[in-house]
Design a protein with these regions (language model features):
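Class I S-adenosyl-L-methionine-dependent methyltransferase catalytic core
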Residues: 1-112, 116-301
């Protein structure tokens, strides 16, 4: 789902093609490329198709020496000089739900992309139902979607490395902002997006590192919810080390979740004194990590 002429995802995997031992790299373009039909024409598409700027796919099976970090669009033209690499038009518009794109998906072992955020509720279920490994850029609030939430709760999807505020390059015509915006010495404009994260089902060592907990439970510090048998913990750093009942934590806890330490029970919108809190993950300490009775603080030696 990335235009090979403009996508940094494509450039990254071209640079590391040999290092990663890749057999094939496939990229499809939904929106017509602003580069492919101008600076570096798509070969053999015909004038009619060129005028329509139809979507295309590129299949790379051989990559020579690439000098990082720069891979300009001209590298695509160089890649296509190798007869083993091919760029061709798609029959449809490149929608990931189309039959031809689903057939391309079946060829893949791993999907890495920045999907349309508005379609995340369709994209993530598709990848999981098709049994594909994936590393995709998203927003932490996507876990609150009804279609996405079950995969977090059942442990079939989690967060990868890095989350929070990400800086993204934006076009030159992007309007300057008072906050979360900058322009570097080269004139490149940047926009910072909060709550950005990587969704994945690829296991990583970070996922199995338990949180170091130092806070101590007290009823005054951790009030109970009106509608759930759980206590409120407003920050993941303040999870009480001596509590073995159900704890409500913000969704910002998720990057630090260790499945061997806690189980995720639900995603809810609880109330305290009649006032709704934002979405909370209800978590509980794994039995092997504690022995106190449900809802009671453990004894601290």
């Amino acid at each position: 789902c990335d235009d090979p002429y403009e996508s940094n995802f494509f450039k990254y995997f071209v640079i590391h093609f040999q290092e990663f031992g890749l057999k094939k790299l496939i990229a499809t373009c939904y929106a017509a490329s602003q580069v492919a039909y101008t600076q570096f024409p798509v070969p053999d598409v015909g004038e009619e198709n060129r005028a329509e700027k139809k979507s295309s796919k590129i299949v790379i099976t051989q990559v020579g020496q690439v000098t990082p970090p720069d891979t300009a669009p001209s590298d695509v033209a160089a890649l296509l000089k190798n007869p083993n690499n091919q760029l061709s038009l798609l029959e449809g518009d490149g929608d990931f739900r189309s039959q031809e794109c689903l057939e391309l998906l079946e060829e893949c072992d791993l999907v890495a992309t920045n999907p349309p955020f508005s379609l995340m509720k369709e994209y993530i279920p598709l990848l999981i139902q098709r049994g594909k490994q994936f590393i995709i850029l998203g927003n932490l609030n996507h876990i609150t979607f009804r279609e996405v939430k079950p995969f977090v709760l059942e442990g079939s999807m989690w967060l990868g490395y890095h989350s929070g505020h990400f800086w993204f390059r934006v076009p030159s015509n992007y309007e300057a902002k008072g906050t979360d915006y900058k322009q570097d010495a080269d004139g490149q404009k940047w926009r910072r997006m909060g709550n950005s994260c990587w969704f994945t089902n690829v296991d990583i060592p970070k996922r199995h590192v338990p949180l170091t907990l130092e806070a101590v439970y007290s009823p005054q510090r951790y009030p109970k919810y009106d509608d759930y048998d759980a206590i409120e913990c407003g920050k993941y750093r303040e999870i009480p080390a001596d509590y073995r009942g159900v704890i409500g934590v913000p969704i910002t806890y998720l990057p630090y979740h260790c499945p061997e330490q806690f189980e995720i029970l639900a995603l809810v919108t609880p109330k305290i004194d009649g006032k709704s809190k934002y979405k909370r993950l209800l978590i509980r300490r794994r039995p092997e990590n504690g022995g106190a009775e449900h809802g009671q603080p453990a004894e601290v030696p």
